[in-house]
From Swiss-Prot:
It comes from Bradyrhizobium diazoefficiens (strain JCM 10833 / BCRC 13528 / IAM 13628 / NBRC 14792 / USDA 110). Belongs to the TRAFAC class TrmE-Era-EngA-EngB-Septin-like GTPase superfamily. EngA (Der) GTPase family. PANTHER family: GTPASE DER. The lineage of its organism: Bacteria, Pseudomonadati, Pseudomonadota, Alphaproteobacteria, Hyphomicrobiales. Residues 365-449 form the KH-like domain. This is GTPase Der. The gene is der. Associates with the 50S ribosomal subunit.
Length: 460
């Protein structure tokens, strides 16, 4: 069982900076504005030879009952209940505030080991605030600078006394080549994206069976890409809920820009992307832009038509209408899976999870060279390539170079002369022949070398 630590404290004391330092990459948004982190988020952390799970939380703050701030506090309380130990973080430059003192009592009542961390201790101004932290009665403050990496040795010494002896384990490298068996058992990385307030967090909360992610009628409740583990019928999924992707003209605040960048990183890290659309306002310009981004990044795509419970007309006719719209507006991912869901009511969840698993299998698919070239001969015979500048194009053969997504190289006589329309014909024909709906298909043109090009001409 992994040792788990929750980082707690009032807003803007540097909790997310410490989280990023321990995880080793920027998984949490960091800014000078209070309350940047809204949900609790987890990561696998390392400090020297110590390995543990770390939870970053929203800043402890007092808010009206039922307000978003109050629910942020509930998320923090849930993280404390899950943790084996706590990092209570204070700002050494500012010193103690009444909020620090109030929530120090809160931390003591948790009955968990607490390490008092005086962050932002670099320079002369940090010493006074760190000394002031003694008054909290949580032991000696550990002076660090999460931003600059100072004091990590002292934090290591204190944490090592709390943790059990580490157990040696073999670790799979995340980017190591996978066998078919490994690909079938490894957690599928899924990013759930969409416009703000499309219902992304509500859907994940229903999958988890708990309010792990904050939800609100206010657009933009989620700010970070939040990763959660889900087991569905014995299959593991790592699901990223993301900040809503808005039109660029509406991204005004600095924090909003950080959130969108975080969502884009989640798309690039994912293997399957679920684009959630409001059923009553589907295929708006921003939906199409997001789908195009997913295709360009080479990720498998699944469309989730959310709020299906609000539709007046349901059934096969409504789904067929969705399919026609999708094929019209998204020809680059023709046949993309579409699932009608209600994140609030829990309708369509099983179908969505199966669609994700199917899309992942298609994204990983390899086609044998013999089957590929049998199809290729038939496709070219049925619709030969056009003549360009009075010369017939010669298409030689095709081979698959990789999966994830399926990528192919087509050898031909003049690569720059093959029309894009003919390339689209081959792509759509291949999708139909090998059942590759919705996943990006890459066909790269390459000229076949002329074996006689470099031979000397015989003397006459």
């Amino acid at each position: 069982m992994s040792f788990t630590i929750a980082i707690i404290g009032r807003p803007n004391v540097g909790k997310s900076t410490l989280f990023n330092r321990l995880v080793g990459q920027k998984l949490a948004l960091v800014d000078d504005l209070p309350g940047v982190t809204r949900d609790r988020r987890e990561g696998e952390a390392r400090l020297g030879d110590l390995e543990f799970t770390i939870i970053d939380t929203a800043g402890l703050d007092e808010g009206a009952k039922g307000s978003l701030t109050a629910r942020m506090q509930e998320q923090t309380e849930a993280a404390i209940a899950q943790a084996d130990a706590l990092f209570f973080v204070v700002d050494a430059r500012i010193g103690l505030t009444p909020t620090d003192r109030a929530f120090a009592d809160f931390a003591r009542r948790a009955n968990k080991p607490v390490l008092l961390v005086a962050n932002k201790s670099e320079g002369k101004h940090g010493d006074a605030g760190a000394m002031e932290a003694f008054a909290l009665g949580l032991g000696d403050p550990i002076q660090i600078s999460a931003e600059h990496g100072e004091g990590m040795g002292e934090l290591y010494d204190a944490l090592a006394k709390l943790m059990p002896e580490p157990v040696e384990e073999d670790e799979d490298e995340d980017d190591a080549p996978l066998s078919e068996e490994e690909a079938a058992t490894r957690p599928i990385r899924v990013a759930i994206v969409g416009r703000p307030n499309a219902g992304k967090s509500t859907l994940i909360n229903h999958l988890l069976g708990e309010e792990r992610l904050l939800t609100s009628p206010e657009a933009g409740t989620t700010r970070d890409s939040i990763a959660v583990e889900i087991n569905w019928k014995g299959r593991e999924f790592r699901v990223f809920d993301t900040a809503g992707l808005r039109r660029r003209s509406r991204i005004e605040e600095k924090l909003e820009k950080l959130s969108v960048a975080d969502a884009l990183r989640a798309v690039r890290f994912a293997e399957v992307v679920v684009l959630m659309m409001d059923t009553q306002n589907r295929f708006e310009e921003q939906d199409l832009r997001i789908a195009d981004l997913v295709e360009r990044e080479g990720r498998a795509l699944v469309l989730a038509a959310n709020k299906w419970d609000l539709m007046e007309t349901k059934g096969g006719g409504a789904i067929s209408g969705l399919r026609r719209d999708a094929d019209h507006w998204l020809p680059q991912v023709k046949g993309v899976p579409i699932v009608a869901v209600s994140g609030l009511m829990g309708e369509g969840i099983d179908r969505l999870m199966q669609a994700i698993q199917d899309a992942y299998a298609v994204w990983n698919r390899r086609v044998s060279t013999s089957a590929l070239n049998r199809w290729f001969e038939q496709a070219v015979q049925a619709n030969p390539p056009p003549a360009v500048s009075g010369r017939r194009l010669k298409l030689n053969y095709i081979t698959q170079t990789k999966a994830r997504p399926p990528s192919f190289v087509l050898f031909c006589s003049r690569a720059d002369a093959v029309p894009q329309s003919y390339l689209r014909y081959l792509t759509n024909s291949m999708r139909e022949a090998f059942d590759l709906p919705g996943t990006p298909v890459r066909i790269t043109l390459r000229e076949k070398a002329n074996p006689f090009a470099h031979k000397r001409k015989r003397p006459s």
